[in-house]
UniProtKB/Swiss-Prot annotation:
Record field: compositional bias (Gly residues): 58-99
Name of the protein in question: Major prion protein 2
Coarse class of the protein's main subcellular location: membrane
Positions that bind Cu(2+) 2: H72, G74
Amino-acid positions noted as binding Cu(2+) 4 in the UniProt annotation, renumbered to this chain: H88, G90, G91
Length: 256
């Protein structure tokens, strides 16, 4: 009988202590943040009061108006108005300007070359009537059948395009039509653009350029065809009734 009473009292005491600890954790701490009325330093007479009495014409510790420790108008520690540590008016710390300019982050500068290049590329593609500009490629290593042509190509390959113009693959019935159109528009556009800059191409240049661009157009067709079929497979997959039913069920579980 005595043991049961002792056990009950121990249980009650444990519950009371647990409740008190929980309340203490939820209870907000007295006082406030910085400068909310409480004293940060010992020896102050009244709560919320200043350690030193205010003097005429200023805030706490200001003999002549201004920030703390200012004999004249200005920022903290400014004898004549200016940035911190500045003997005379002017800029932020170490330079001209106001006190508020100390830590202003500098605005990122826009690279005007990139903007101009992007705008020019967009104008060219838009002016070609629906053609798109492919990504840059490495110029292929091609053998033309003679040592002279092979050497000429290695020495002048940088003058030939490394990007091709093309239309979506679904507008063509086969690869040959895509490549033929891609080669014609790319060689024509590159020739006109380069000739405008004062550089001319010989017949050998045109011959080599067509071979190089043909290889790049074939590569571009393979990339676009693969991406096109992948998009089509994704559409078919997500439009099938079982997948639609599964997605609807998952949405119902999440919302419900």
């Amino acid at each position: 009988m005595v043991k049961s009473h002792i056990g009950s009292w121990i249980l009650v005491l444990f519950v009371a202590m647990w409740s008190d600890v929980a309340l203490c954790k939820k209870r907000p701490k007295p006082g406030g943040g910085w400068n909310t009325g409480g004293s940060r330093y010992p020896g102050q007479g009244s709560p919320g009061g200043n350690r030193y009495p205010p003097q005429e014409g200023g805030d706490w510790g200001q003999p002549h108006g201004g920030g703390w420790g200012q004999p004249h108008v200005g920022g903290w520690g400014q004898p004549h108005g200016g940035g911190w540590g500045q003997p005379h008016g002017g800029g932020g710390w170490g330079q001209g300007g106001t006190h508020g300019q100390w830590n202003k982050p500098s605005k990122p500068k826009t690279n005007m070359k990139h903007v101009a290049g992007a705008a020019a590329a967009g104008a060219v593609v838009g002016g070609l009537g629906g053609y798109m500009l492919g990504s840059a490629m490495s110029r292929p290593l091609i053998h033309f059948g003679s040592d002279y042509e092979d050497r000429y190509y290695r020495e002048n390959m940088y003058r030939y395009p490394n990007q091709v113009y093309y239309r979506p693959v679904d507008q063509y019935s086969n690869q040959n039509n895509f490549v033929h159109d891609c080669v014609n528009i790319t060689v024509k556009q590159h020739t006109v653009t380069t000739t405008t800059k004062g550089e001319n191409f010989t017949e050998t240049d045109i011959k080599m350029m067509e071979r190089v661009v043909e290889q790049m157009c074939i590569t571009q067709y393979q990339r676009e065809s693969e991406a096109y079929y992948q998009r089509g497979a994704s559409v078919i997959l997500f439009s099938s009734p079982p997948v639609i039913l599964l997605i609807s069920f998952l949405i119902f579980l999440i919302v419900g």
